[in-house]
Amino acid sequence: MVLEIVLITGMSGSGKSVALHALEDAGYYCVDNLPPQLLPAFVALEHHHHGNRVAIAMDVRSATSLHQVPQELHRLRSQGVAVQSIFLDATIDTLVRRFSETRRRHPLSHDDPQQERKALVQIIDLERELLADLREASHVIDTSQIRASQLQSYVKSLMPGAQGQLTLVFQSFAFKRGIPMDADYVFDVRMLANPYYEPALRELTGLDEPVADFLQLQPDVDLMRAHIEQFLAHWLELLDRNHRSYVTVAIGCTGGQHRSVYLVERLAQSFGNRWTALKRHRELDGRQ
């Protein structure tokens, strides 16, 4: 059987432990804070002792060796290992708030607590710089506006793509709450007719049939969908040929409730026949 390796990295406070626990629940043998220089020996050992599914978490405490990881992942892939690298991220405001709420110290913090509070933003900026190469080589998940249970479910949903097939993630969002940090492509659909201004549709979402019926009658909506599909169809083929594992396509409208949700549903349906297509509705998920 093909050996599956899932690497979990990312910013301190972004949810790496939550993601690792999700993989443990899914049947992966998990290890936390593995030094990067031990990765080759560990992979060889665990393949013989713990089966075919291994998840590894690394953080910035191994910063001096992390630059080796992308090259090592490439080597493992060339040997037929199915490797996924997931990088968890969040906005700086979110990370600062999480450290404040948990009262935990940042791994790169100074010994002086007073200095730590003053420098937390600078420490996070330094961490982001140290992890930049690893982030570039990974599938990025923005955890700023999702709960732990939602992150666990999302990480588990990514696992079927471990065999190297391109996985598309279509995500709806509200511009007023910020563009998702993990988006590879962002499409603005705020110029389309808004069901919010129809009293009978205001409290519904793009998942509801009356909203879908309304939007299907708008020529510009269908034209927007067709143009997005045409753009993606061309470039996804190239990304697939270059062995890209994940592409996140974010569709944004004003409230993330009607237009973007509807288009995400239609795009996922359209591209699901060719690739693995996942759906996320950021603002709707936050209601649950």
UniProtKB/Swiss-Prot annotation:
Database matches in Gene3D superfamilies: P-loop containing nucleotide triphosphate hydrolases
SUPFAM superfamilies: P-loop containing nucleoside triphosphate hydrolases (SSF52540)
UniProt GO molecular function: ATP binding; GTP binding
Keyword annotations: ATP-binding, GTP-binding, Nucleotide-binding
InterPro entries listed in its UniProt record: P-loop_NTPase, RapZ-like, RapZ-like_N, RapZ_C
Residues engaged in binding ATP: G10, M11, S12, G13, S14, G15, K16, S17
Sites where the protein binds GTP: D59, V60, R61, S62
Function: Displays ATPase and GTPase activities.
PANTHER family to which the protein is assigned, alphabetical: RNASE ADAPTER PROTEIN RAPZ (PTHR30448:SF0)
NCBIfam families, per the entry: PRK05416.1
Sequence similarity: Belongs to the RapZ-like family.
Name of the protein in question: Nucleotide-binding protein Veis_1053
Species assigned in the record: Verminephrobacter eiseniae (strain EF01-2)
